[in-house]
Amino acid sequence: MGISSNGYSDDLGWNWRFGVWNQELTQTKSGYKGDHYQGEFASRLARTAWYDEASGGRGYIHLALSSSFGVPDGNSPTNNQARYRTRPEARTDSRWLDTGRIAGADRNSVFGFESVVNVGGFSWTSEYLQTKVERQPAFGPNVTFKGLYTQFAYVLTGEHHPWDRKTGTLGRLKPFENFFMVRDCDGCRQKGMGAWEVAFRYSHEDLNDDKEVTENNG
């Protein structure tokens, strides 16, 4: 449950969104533990620094900052807990990285930076996130985790990834031709290559904190 707002500037150069929520109870989902009130504030400010109108948006640069602040607000005898775990992009069965339970989580915050550069069929996307868990003094020092990814891609068949300047998000790539053999609106079979793209992606996540937490490999 919550309330949020979003908007964009008249020239579509800026867009933003922010909101306040009462986070869902997550005791059974390996998240924060506590009573029903778990407030969170989240925001994102994005800038389309360049957009090539002449080519229909085949070139653009996007930059954005994001943040969120949460208060688990647990109650005795169940002390607040936090846990961070994840799978790789291949979506393996097990989660490769897992902090385990972090006791005494009093507040949490996330700060992020993201960027997208697109020129024709070439695109470069990247994002960096830093998460801090503030703990009750009796349970130990605060802990910080970091993660990032960067990806280079090229569309071999000439399409591009469109950009939505009102929301600051990537749109769906639309192939120039349907793939292989499909029927058109007249019922005739048409041949096409579809859309083909090659990509290289590097991602890194550090769920260790020298002061307290050592990640568990699944």
Predicted regions and their residues:
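Short loop/turn segments at secondary-structure transitions that flank enzyme active sites
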Residues: 11, 24, 51, 71, ...
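A residue-level signal for beta-strand positions that form part of recognition/binding surfaces
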Residues: 2, 15, 42, 60-62, ...
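Extended catalytic-interface subdomain
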Residues: 18-20, 59-71
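Surface-exposed coil loops of outer-membrane beta-barrel proteins
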Residues: 1-46, 50-55, 73-105, 184-185
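Outer-membrane beta-barrel pore domains
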Residues: 59, 67, 76-218
